[in-house]
Amino acid sequence: MRPKGIDLFKVAGIQIAIDYSWIVIFLLVSWSLSAGYFPHEYPGYAWGAYLTVGVVATLLFFASVVTHELAHSLVANRLGQPVRRITLFIFGGMAHLSREPSNATAEMKIAVVGPLTSLALGALFWVCKRIVAGAGLPLLWAAVFKYLAFINVALALFNLLPGFPLDGGRILRGLLWRRSGDLRAPRRVRRIGEPASPSV
């Protein structure tokens, strides 16, 4: 059955799509940033400026989520676990793996690259923040990159929690799988990570 949603574009043969629920969270995050975070932290700008940076920051945040999922997908494709679709939805993003990894090493490689990518994006956005601030451009634009730096680091740390199906849970599953040679390790990971893992 074809997943419901809107197809946007393809990257390396992988279809990027949005679920209809994503529109709701996009509007909520844009409004929260435009009417709450940026005016509170950086007062004195016009409403139009807050709206602009709020929408731009939200788009770049979700671009970061797509990049995180693309990292998973490209590594999975290279390891023979085909991914043909990534969907953004109300709780974030999801790469649609055609099947589960065939061995513990593949499991860990596919899982760990996501948080590493988010950390790299956090560092990149922090450098952008320093460049914008040093160039004498409006502080509000430096604030956008500062927000994106922190949110990407937070995304990486959250995904490293040992709760399935977070990346940390998959890494732990791979470690248990490698150590025991037992494919039933995921059940133990779910028990270990249950308190830490909300629906994502």
Show the residue positions of the predicted features:
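Hydrophobic transmembrane alpha-helices and their immediate loop junctions
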Residues: 1-200
